[in-house]
Amino acid sequence: RGYLAGLGIQTAALAVAGYKPPSFALSNDVEQYDGTSWSEIAEINTAVAARAGAGTTTAGLVFGGTPPTTANTESWNGSAWTEGNNLNTARAYLAGFGIQTLALAAGGGPSITANTEEYDGTSWTEVNNLATARQQLAGNGTGTAGLVYGGTTGSQTAATEEWTVPSSISNVTVASS
């Protein structure tokens, strides 16, 4: 699959939804990795691609995606997916990081945005925007400390932004590519 969401750690991860080759049909398949092998688990409710993920294999979260561009949020409790409150801004190709009760959604598209939202386990709240609006970026970290980096602003960028609570986005650097 391509354009799927991922969450978890090296020895316990989920690969969620995306497009199936060769037809690029949307998939609601979810697979779990145990550090050695992959196995299929309960399907997600909404089949979309290019969404972001946060959390663990027992307390996970996926959000955003396309087509169509959506604000959809679903949480995972280790055995089933549940619809949650939507992002305030529908988008795909965004970065996500954190845990199920403190996650961040940053950037995205298809209209390139700097929008950043924080999830508290129940709802999304708009917080400080990225310094560099972009989509197709990556992110990692906890809800209180993380990074977003790379992506496209219309052309590729190596911009890296550090997230810290309570100060929000700070310490913008541009790494060499």
Label for each model-derived stretch:
Residues 1-177:
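Polar, enzyme-active/binding microenvironments
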